[in-house]
Curated annotation (Swiss-Prot):
Protein name stated in the entry: Protein translocase subunit SecE
Subunit record text: Component of the Sec protein translocase complex. Heterotrimer consisting of SecY (alpha), SecG (beta) and SecE (gamma) subunits. The heterotrimers can form oligomers, although 1 heterotrimer is thought to be able to translocate proteins. Interacts with the ribosome. May interact with SecDF, and other proteins may be involved.
Organism placement in taxonomy: Archaea, Methanobacteriati, Methanobacteriota, Stenosarchaea group, Methanomicrobia
Organism: Methanosarcina barkeri (strain Fusaro / DSM 804)
Family designation: Belongs to the SecE/SEC61-gamma family.
Compartments, as annotated in UniProt: Cell membrane
GO cellular component: plasma membrane
GO MF term set: protein transmembrane transporter activity
Membrane topology: Single-pass membrane protein
Amino acid sequence: MVESTFEPKITAESVGQVIRAHLRVLKLTRKPSREEFLTIAKVAGVGILAVGAIGFIIYVLLTMLPQWVAQ
């Protein structure tokens, strides 16, 4: 059996680097305006509805197709 040679090394320095990287990103962020928030919410809602509609169409096809083929 092949042994894994990967040994993760977590050090205080590597943890500090990750925290600094996250803080740098957080400093660049800002609160979205109401208009930006509404636009993002609308786009996300349309995406969710589209995925649901596609799933429903696939469900209907998979349940109705065997009945159509059997006739």
